[in-house]
Amino acid sequence: MKTAKIYQYQLPMDSGVILREQRLQQRDGLVIELSDGIHTARGEVAPLPEFSQETLEQAREDLISLTQSWLNNEELDLDSNCPSVAFGFSMALLELEKQLPQEGNYQAAPLCSGDPDDLVVKLNEMSGKKIAKIKVGLYEPIRDGMVVNMFLELISDLSLRLDANRGWTAKKAEQFANYVHPQFRSRIEFLEEPCATPEESLAFSKATDIAIAWDETVRDDGFTVKTQEGVTAIVIKPTLVGSVEKCISLIEQAHQLGMQAVISSSIESSLALTQLARLAAWKTPETIPGLDTIDLFKMQLDTSWPNCDLPVAQLADLEAIWEN
């Protein structure tokens, strides 16, 4: 017999986590637990403030309605629900049907969100290919350019992924590029969405020979993966995109065109983060995913991230907010 439970969690965050204009002091989310009478599986529904189109309250309503439909054996159209619900529920179904391989790719590209010295330490500990991610667009573009140039000059086998979150005008993007030496630009694996519009970002890439990737653009209505000069990758954040099936379709479209598809975190808890690592190992085995976000938390949830010493909150200790 089918049964389901929905839990709500609150996890404390590191004090330095800032999303656009908002400091994220705690991460709020939902966990859907599905059982078919034999097996039990879980998925996480955690809209990201400032980035998700839906609120947690809207996601909760959507999730309850979808869960009821599943219990009633109705046909499900997962992506007619808000993206975080479509992702979390589809992941729970995938787990329930034993279709998500256990092996994960936990070699996350380290994220520099503050002190550059911290990134140097992480990179020195890395074995194999050195790839790191730096958030740009939070400070003056000239400073960003100097920091990027410094890393590329300092570590000769380093490749960087940069993320501007559409934060620059065309002029500011140009200022950034002026401070990155042309000989180093090929080691920028890609710069996610440098400018406010895709058109400006494409023009920036053409003028600077700096490769770009689509992130926010992937979530625009009607987006399809296509060959465009300068675009070498798409970044897929499943919590913001939708069902696992939709994400896999985007991955396959990118691979068919010779582009990278990078599975990336939306600051989910360790429960969903480990599932994303498994999805990455399964569908993007040649690409290091963008999942270096566990250190932004003060606590894990249900499933521990490998080699992470943070305490783990158990779902069993949380009260179910809905069950049937």
From Swiss-Prot:
Q: What class of enzyme is it?
A: lyase
Q: In which pathway does it act?
A: Quinol/quinone metabolism; 1,4-dihydroxy-2-naphthoate biosynthesis; 1,4-dihydroxy-2-naphthoate from chorismate: step 4/7; Quinol/quinone metabolism; menaquinone biosynthesis
Entry annotation: catalytic residues: K135, K237
> Could you tell me which InterPro entries the record lists for this protein?
Enolase-like_C_sf (IPR036849), Enolase-like_N (IPR029017), Enolase_C-like (IPR029065), Mandelate_racemase_C (IPR013342), OSB_synthase_MenC1 (IPR010196), OSBS_N (IPR041338)
In terms of superkingdom, the source organism counts as: Bacteria
BP GO annotations: menaquinone biosynthetic process
Q: Which reaction does it catalyse?
A: (1R,6R)-6-hydroxy-2-succinyl-cyclohexa-2,4-diene-1-carboxylate = 2-succinylbenzoate + H2O
Where Mg(2+) binds, per the record, is at D163, E192, D215
Q: Does the keyword Magnesium apply?
A: yes
Q: What cofactors does the UniProt entry give for this protein?
A: a divalent metal cation
Keywords linked to the UniProt accession: Lyase, Magnesium, Menaquinone biosynthesis, Metal-binding
One example GO MF annotation: magnesium ion binding
Q: What is its EC number?
A: 4.2.1.113
Sequence similarity: Belongs to the mandelate racemase/muconate lactonizing enzyme family. MenC type 1 subfamily.
Q: Name the job this protein performs.
A: Converts 2-succinyl-6-hydroxy-2,4-cyclohexadiene-1-carboxylate (SHCHC) to 2-succinylbenzoate (OSB).
- What is the protein named? o-succinylbenzoate synthase
- Gene that encodes it: menC
